[in-house]
Amino acid sequence: KFEPGTQFEYNSLNTYMLSAVLRKKTGMSLTEFLTPRLYEPLDIRSHHWETCPKGMEKGGWGLNLCIEDLAKIAQLYLNRGVWNGRRLLSEEWIDAATSPQIPTPNGEMRHGYGYQIWMSGGGAYQFNGAFGQYAVIFPQYDAVAIIYSGSTQLFAKTSLMQLLDSCFWACSDRELAPYPPGYDSLKAYLAKLVFSPEPERKGLGTDKIAFNKIRSLLDGREFRLFDNYGSLFPQPLQNVHGCYSKGADIIRFSSTEKGLAVTFYEQCERNTVYIDMDGGFTDSVFIMKEEQHLVSTRGIWSAGESEACITLFTSFLETPDTRIIELRILNESIEAVFDETPTAE
């Protein structure tokens, strides 16, 4: 389309290629390269980077970090590459990475792009991930803000980000004059703050009589889906992982001690989720093209004389994504309606 470096077009595969180049040049995986240089100095112990079929980290996506550890990386940049008195990144690199290397005139992020970093304007910059994952660095206020969320907006500036911007841009560069009454009020307020006790996890108040009726109706039954393109795997995750499904072909039900197992057949894949009759969550492992994903499923249901309806909520625990499937069973037929949250709009 154009000569490299002359125009901007967002493309995560470019960063995947950088991961491949690093492996070729160093003989190390991206994780092996980063461990002594970044993870160990920052005491980042819980990390996982998804790999491609060739065993290379995907580079442009697929990094899983705790929110506290992402905050450490953001703080490292705020410290201009220094951590606990030790320099991990050169100041020259920090300056180059956090400065506009190419203009981004289109879209909502129009302040330019550095080295995998978006400029936010006013000297701020951010690591921006899909569906509301942010690390925003405000050097002029000596602050970082970390946000993990499940926004329906893919990369655009969300209302939460706009609120964050408005709070920081309202700050003054001048020191506040002493105001003892306000300070005393703040201390008293902070002293009263406590963590709420962990609430008891309860079911959804679902009807066990209706559930047992549905379970006896569906136990051992199998339904074939025609002209269906919906998958148990949410569409955003299909796009991110490059694991595309042609849709579920068959749904099979079987009774369990605590509820009902629902198995989805999709081409060569077979995945089972579980409904707890108490309305609670049940964990399982979802597999798509050899990649494993931890999921947790709950269900709600209703039953009539000759029909039943089950709604499944399957959350992919390592992501912000939840697949929602409504199954309407009438006599010998089934209708499956697929939805998800967040969804790219």
Annotate the PLM regions.
Residues 91-148, 154:
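Active-site Gly/Thr loop motif
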Residues 14-21, 59-82, 133-150:
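Active-site-proximal alpha-helical segments within enzyme catalytic domains
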Residues 129-204:
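Structured C-terminal helix/loop/strand segments within mature extracytoplasmic catalytic/sensor domains
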Residues 1-63:
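Catalytic-site signature segments of enzymes, centered on catalytic residues
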Residues 19-23, 34-35, 39, 71-78, ...:
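Non-transmembrane alpha-helical segments in soluble domains
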Residues 181-345:
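Peripheral terminal and inter-domain segments
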Residues 59, 66, 93, 113, ...:
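Residues that flank catalytic or metal-binding motifs in active/ligand-binding sites
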Residues 66-77, 82-104:
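A conserved catalytic-loop motif detector
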